[in-house]
Structures are given as C-alpha cells and as structure tokens.
Amino acid sequence: MPQEPMPISQIAIVVKDIHAAMDAYQKALGWGPWNVYEHKPPSLHHTELHGEPTDYTMIGAETHVGPIVVELIQPGEGPSIYKEWLETKGEGLHHIACMAHTQ
C-alpha cells in the first residue's frame, strides 16, 4: 500500500550575500519578513566536514512561506559544508527537509 507523501517542512538555499538574497526574494516572490541569526562556536558545536572536526560560522535567515520554512545560509569563517557547496556548485538549493510520518 502506498505511503502518504511526506510534507516538505524546510527548503535551504546557500547564498553569497544574505542581505542581497533576502531583498531579491522579497522583491521577486514577496517572501519575508526574514528572521536573521548568526551561528558560531560555542553554540554551534560538534560540527564535522568529511569526518573531521571543524569550527565555522554562518549567517542564516528564515521566513515562512505557508507551512514551509525557507532558510537562506551565508557561509562565514572556517571550512563548512555550506562554504564547500558555494565554492563548488554556486548559489542555490542545498537541502530540503521533510516531516517523517510516525507510527
């Protein structure tokens, strides 16, 4: 029997300039207002890149588009999955999160 589709809860986009991206999404799609935050050690901890410990910083911004959280991520200092993504693939979709069904 087919399982019900898992609903999308979050879409994360890696960007070079978070303020320019917030402005562009606001103007083009009406997304906002944005809640901006900075993640850095020590609150950002137990982070790894390719199985090795790493410390990094990032700036994030979130807004709701209906039931979906749209998150923009601007890499900061230190090696991270977000900085690597930006350097190798450029700006764009990084991940989509879904709500898992519970039994």
Positions of PLM-derived features:
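Core segments of cupin and vicinal oxygen chelate
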Residues: P5, V14-G66
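Vicinal oxygen chelate
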Residues: V15-A20, G32-P33, Y37, V65-V69, ...
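Conserved structured catalytic cores and adjacent interaction surfaces
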Residues: I11
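Short, flexible turn/loop "capping" segments at secondary-structure junctions
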Residues: M1-P5, T88-G90
